[in-house]
């Protein structure tokens, strides 16, 4: 099962790999995908673009199964979108500038609550839904790096993303047991400097996320 926050290219260029590589490695069930409006069309276009590859693997000498390349897509709105024996998933809209359909997700298990911000400027809805979470995974940009940007980029980033100073304020309100930083815009800063900027206004536990580690 996969959950997409929004359809910006930096969040979707790996989508074909997510569909096809596990199938090549013998996944024999469809991939289940939840995402915003537009994900159905994107999925159809990806499958069409790779049509020759799919047909070759199924009809040629490669013994690929005929099921694992399929995708079952649900276009979501806010609220509970998924539940099984292990986890309940709640989607909520976030403030990613003028991008209409951007979501965060709250994952609830028997012993943990994890909130993923997606791409967002400071969001009252995210603050409310993430209060008391075990882990808050939140995007961030360096305030000192931002200060060196041009005015036109400052205007863009301030409406689409969250600074270290703003995130410290959010964490002070929501009080997660762990604040995990992701989608970091460094602009010449280091991981250590990003952490220091947050810790200047927040005393809780904070770590830089490392994908696939």
Predicted regions and their residues:
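Binuclear metal-dependent hydrolase catalytic cores
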Residues: 1-115, 193-213
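Cap/insert and terminal regions of metallo-dependent hydrolase folds
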Residues: 103-104, 111-113, 121-212
């Amino acid at each position: 099962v996969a959950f997409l926050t929004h359809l910006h290219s930096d969040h979707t260029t790996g989508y074909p790999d997510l569909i096809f590589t596990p199938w090549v490695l013998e996944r024999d069930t469809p991939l289940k995908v939840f995402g915003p409006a537009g994900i159905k069309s994107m999925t159809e276009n990806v499958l069409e673009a790779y049509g020759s590859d799919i047909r070759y693997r199924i009809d040629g000498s490669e013994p690929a199964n005929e099921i694992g390349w399929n995708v079952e897509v649900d276009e979501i709105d806010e609220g509970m979108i998924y539940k099984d024996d292990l986890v309940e998933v709640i989607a909520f809209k976030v403030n990613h500038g003028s991008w209409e359909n951007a979501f965060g997700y709250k994952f609830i298990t028997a012993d943990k609550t994890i909130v993923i911000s997606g791409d967002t400027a400071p969001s009252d809805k995210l603050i409310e839904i993430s209060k008391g979470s075990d882990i808050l995974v939140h995007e961030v940009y360096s305030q000192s790096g931002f200060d060196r940007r041009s005015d036109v980029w400052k205007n863009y980033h301030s409406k689409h993303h969250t600074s270290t100073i703003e995130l410290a304020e959010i964490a002070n309100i929501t009080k997660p047991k762990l604040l995990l930083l992701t989608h970091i815009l460094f602009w010449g800063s280091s991981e250590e400097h990003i952490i220091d900027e947050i810790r200047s206004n927040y005393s809780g536990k904070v770590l830089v996320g490392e994908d696939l580690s």
